[in-house]
């Protein structure tokens, strides 16, 4: 007879919980997302200033849409157009210039701090650059989401104040446009972080982003078909700021695929640039 093997812990010895897939996934989430985010939030300098400025710009752009509707109320009523006026007029400049500029300032501030005292190269010596970059990308993503949600809620509030009846379909449409715009904003965030990694000057990084944003406006006016490909036009495309049309499943799929390609390319280039700082 073979004696049974006792796997119980000896008396007086602590029993440790069994690790499994759930614990492993939780630890990976903490290591790859939560920890880098917490570190970058701690390092971030007075983020409330830019957040307040973003809210003020969202208010101004929404007010622009409200005044546009009030100026041509009879015409819009005859056409049966309501909240779309507030959204379209407010989102045009918001998505083309103001949100890309806000993301530019946020990304430039996050990358500039690492150029001080050659922190990028110092972190590269112990393999912390990718973790740091991940935290900055997540933090910029959350900032873009905050900006978009602020604009969305302000348009809803303004529409309600004007007496518009927002149906569930209207709310779903606005939310979809805002989220698609957020996805497009991530493309800009990734691009600006890449610029910030290469360029140590805060002013140069910001001017690059502002120039790219104005070029987006020019492309939108002169060659609208090219705006679907231009990275800094993706917020405008996602928010349907010009067309105010319900996107088809095919157009949404193309938008998501193209922005995923752009983001993947810029993230890979950023990681490559950070690895080169080890040498």
Write out the residue ranges for each language-model feature.
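Terminal transmembrane helical anchor/hairpin motif
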Residues: 2-4, 18, 29-30, 63-86, ...
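Short helix-to-coil transition segments within interhelical loops
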Residues: 123-129
